Amino acid sequence: MTRLLTLGFFLFLCLLCYPNIITVRNIEELNNANKNAKAGDTIILQNGEWKNVTISLDCIGSKEKQVVIKAQTPGKVLITGNSKLKIGGLYIIVDGLYFTNGYAGKDAVITFRSDNKHLANDCRVTNTVINDFNNPKRMDENNWVTFYGKNNELDHCSFIDKKNMGVLLAVILDDERSRENFHSIDHNYFGRRLPLASNGGEIIRVGLSQHCQFNSNTRINNNFFEDCDGEAEIISIKSCANEVKGNVFKECQGSVVLRHGDNNIVMNNYFLGNDKIGSGGVRVINKGQQVSNNIFYKCRGADFRSPLVIMNGVPNSPPTRYVQVTNAEIVDNIFYECSPISLCEGRDAERTLPPDNVNFFNNVFYNTHDSIIYNVYDDIKGIHFTSNKVSDKISQPLTDGFTKTILPKQNNFSKKDTIRKTGSSVNNIPIAEKEVYASSGTNWFKKYSTSSSKKRISINCLTADEIYKQLEINDEVIIQLTGKEYKINKPFIISKTVQFKSDKKNSIKFETENILSLFILSGKGNLFLNSINIDGKNVKATHFISSDSNGYSDHYNLTINNCSFQNFNYKNGCQNIFYAFKYMIADSITINSNSFINNNCNFFFMNEEKEDKGYYNSEKVFIGHNNFNSQRGTLLNIYRGGSDESTLGPNLTFSHNKLSNCNGTDPLIILTGVQVSNIFSNNFSSCNPSSTLIFYKDLVRAKHNFERNTLTNSGKIEKNGFVTEVVNTIK
């Protein structure tokens, strides 16, 4: 009997110690399983939709026996609605979740703490996807991932389409519990991030300016970044002793920026610009930075986005401004068919300290397209150039430390006689890109693709009611306007791809009530107006077309092609042909080959972002090959206020337009803070003859080209030092 009791007690102890596998079906069961979990347990989330859930984990595992919380099938546990994941325990692994069709509000989607007192340590999130999981409104800021604690890892995850304000991934160093953290961010796929039209669109930020003197020791290794165009900084380092190694940056309009903090390493990375405008590399600020053994391939960024930027500093700078670059090493890098690097960048009335004690050696510049390899904006005597090789085709006189030589043509990656460096080579690009791409992200979620699989239908619409019906279905639609007059009692809401067209033989009359807009471009709206003669005499809507005033995070596009607009009049109620409300962003606005005749209203207004924080309403604006005749009102007003230097836009092209007898009480074209404008090959005749034709205003560096225009009996150009005039004719 004693033996039986002993054996039973022993078996009972074994059962207590043996790890459990628990399947949970809802958040209540998960909370209970988390509460009772012990080291080595596995909690399986049943496949299906988990909507409006806060998953909070504070269980305790061990180094040998982690607590695993995993999807029954990776990608089949859908976290939707207002949902988030909080991890505040020890040795926890989360595996296989899919965040989609939802948002997290002010919180991060994934946070490595359950509350302020319970931080994650030695925890891991893997094989997980966050896809387009944005707050509905663009200005409602949050992160997708925030790191706290120490020794946490994020690996083999995929992140695509963050659109609202806020850094995608932030490493927080707000107290000692999260400093010298040795976090690992590795083998992840960071996919498309569209231009945010604001600061704060980074993919990864390590630290904040107020914590920049602390060591973070975060490792960002072997990740794949693709089309990360949110702002000038893809990775923003604002702390000390971090490393960025073995990553691929493919066609990203930005750079790895060592913004604050010292002794960071950027090594063995591939920056594959592939001739994309704005594709950058590395920007260096502060002390003791190392940039070595990187490949910069066809990176075509300029200024702050140059392939390599060494900044000027501010005298007696606080750590939170621009500390002088000192004791840096720029070594063993290859620049292949890149735009010029930038030395002493940012030189202005404040940033007057050039770099000092910078070792710049054994770098290779292969270039057959450009005449120069670097721009210099201040004294470079503090940069020590040694053993750098440059293609002999470069015509720029070079300082000592650069040798022009015959470098072999890089047209065959398999050749053995091409440029080589120890550990990195242009030859390795296809191999490295393929390997890092294949090993990044999840294996169950398709990486970002530009192709569209949505069905598109074409239908004739005789009345407004028929149009409303087509706008309510999910399919993309081509609406053929077969009627002559459309009576509108509510706006056409465009939240998908919609094309309106006609045969252009007869005028189309839109008759509206006193509504806000006839067309409202909502999130994901792509509106095409094609070959329509529009009579606006009976349009009482304040705006013929506008963006949605709710400021959604999803972008929109507008294209007007081969249309005519006539008889729009503010006296009838229509103030603007197009009006952009605050906070929403268009990827592109294209106005091509149209006629605007006898209208008495404003045309294209994008001037609501008056907070002067660098916000604006459209990344690219193209107005070309149009005829403007007998117009009353401002033609174009674009506003981007403030002194922020982190964006590429707005970018305006205004070309091959003919303007006759166009007048307004304000300038016809008003450009405030536009980063790039090209106004060329236009003909202005009797346009604002006694006033201002075009007005430029800029607080930060901009590039304005005014070229090959003809001005006859037209107003003056109020320009600044950023405007370049070439071959214009003024009569």
Describe the role of every protein-language-model region.
Residues 1-21:
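Bacterial Sec-dependent N-terminal signal peptides
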Residues 35-39, 61-63, 87-88, 147, ...:
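Flexible, charged surface loops at secondary-structure boundaries
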Residues 51-54, 81-86, 100-121, 131-409, ...:
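Glycine- and acidic/polar-rich repeat regions and solenoidal domains
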Residues 20-52, 56, 447-488, 493:
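Acidic Gly/Asp/Thr-rich repetitive segments characteristic of extracellular carbohydrate-active
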Residues 39-41, 65, 278, 356, ...:
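Short coil/turn segments at beta-strand junctions that form active-site/ligand-binding loops
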Residues 398-460, 474, 712-731:
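Surface beta-loop-beta hairpin patches that serve as ligand-binding interfaces in beta-rich domains
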Residues 58-63, 353, 494, 699-700:
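Short, conserved loop/helix-junction motifs that constitute active-site signature segments
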Residues 21-25, 47-53, 57-109, 132-134, ...:
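Right-handed parallel beta-helix/beta-spiral solenoid domain characteristic of secreted/periplasmic
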